[in-house]
Amino acid sequence: MAKEKEHINVAFIGHVDHGKSTLIGRLLYETGEIPEHIIEKMRKEAQEKGKATFEFAWVMDRLKEERERGVTIDVAHRKFQTDKYYITIVDCPGHRDFIKNMITGASQADAAVLVMDVVEKVQPQTREHIFLARTLGINQIIVAINKMDRVNYDQKEYEAAKEAVSKLLKMVGYKVDEIPFIPVSAYYGDNVAKKSDKTPWYNGPTLLEAFDLLKPPEKLVDKPLRIPIQDVYSISGVGTVPVGRVESGVLRVGDKVVFEPAGVSGEVKSIEMHHEPIQEAYPGDNIGFNVRGVSKKDIRRGDVAGHPDNPPTVVKDFTAQLVVLQHPTAITVGYTPVVHAHTAQIACRFVELQKKIDPRTGQVKEENPQFLKTGDAAIVKLEPTRPMVIERVKDIPPMGRFAIRDMGMTIGAGMVLDLTPRK
């Protein structure tokens, strides 16, 4: 059997209306991932309407109409293949209230595609998303300079847009010479899957080729097992079935597992993915697993499964590098917002503001600051108000990132540098 392609998760980021959905739709269309029956239905309609040329753009218009009528074609975890990878799209829509998704979603992304309108260039969310991608440790980025059809595929316009976004990327510490900047029209398909004859001046990769230039994600297989629990079901005739995504390590049928902070353990009787039984589950797999010896009431969303010889770390407190994205006043010691880490949401108290740092260089700007405000980056110590599992970002990267929410908004994003395990 041929070696299976590696999986890679890609977040689509960028300002609202710069064309993320259209670009995602175009990629799915070009790679044959929009279900045939949908295409077929639209082909028929196209013929009836006398649109002999069945164009993707028309498909996108129809999908958009259906979305506006509240019918979403379910492409939530959307996947497509390139020559080298299976790619899962972690879509990060543009509006402000999606920043939390971006933080919880993007922390699972191995790379990001920044979609930017060639006319509008850098907009507020363009900045915010680049800043966040950086903070969340997304080190690989592809820039799609979209809507080239609006400027007649003019190289000067492309260069101006590239220059504007490069400044920003450099500022937060991306190596701009390693980033592909691709002039595309998601609507017409230029340089998405096929090189466009409208941009003879561009000799870089298409978007599809650029995915194959990404480095595969760090091997999380060799790290300790961690499965944050999303839901727990009790299935008659089967038993207790926790559901979650394997973030690190490998789970095998027959393994003993322990759930923290619940402190209960059991034996894995079976594992299922996409309704198929499997013998072992790897990082990135969304699974349900039947555990003997554990009842549904013992565990809940936010608990984490691991192996007994290297159990998930329950912390007394943790030290983190944090960026304050927005706060109406200022953060001081004693502030207790909700920390969203993996699937857990737990109120944590700020117990120390240790230092303010320059987010770009990491240099200390101020020791023991009195307060933190919007835009500040800092090292802080947080104390969960109830037992919580979190790991150092250097030990298990996906388990060491978190978002801070309060008052219905995302206050900040951070990563765990150190921790004190609970005795």
UniProtKB/Swiss-Prot annotation:
Residues 5-221 form the tr-type G domain. Residues 146-149 are annotated as: G4. Residues 185-187 are annotated as: G5. One of its GO terms (molecular function) is GTP binding. Disulfide bonds: none annotated. The keyword Metal-binding applies. InterPro entries: EFTu-like_2 (IPR004161), G_TR_CS (IPR031157), GTP-eEF1A_C (IPR054696), P-loop_NTPase (IPR027417), Small_GTP-bd (IPR005225), T_Tr_GTP-bd_dom (IPR000795), TRAFAC_GTPase_members (IPR050100), Transl_B-barrel_sf (IPR009000). Its EC number is 3.6.5.3. It is found in: Cytoplasm. It comes from the Archaea. One of its GO terms (cellular component) is cytoplasm. Residues 91-94 are annotated as: G3. It catalyses: GTP + H2O = GDP + phosphate + H(+). The keyword Cytoplasm applies. Belongs to the TRAFAC class translation factor GTPase superfamily. Classic translation factor GTPase family. EF-Tu/EF-1A subfamily. HAMAP family: EF_Tu_A (MF_00118_A). NCBIfam families: EF-1_alpha, PRK12317.1, small_GTP. This is Elongation factor 1-alpha. It comes from Archaeoglobus fulgidus (strain ATCC 49558 / DSM 4304 / JCM 9628 / NBRC 100126 / VC-16). The gene is tuf.
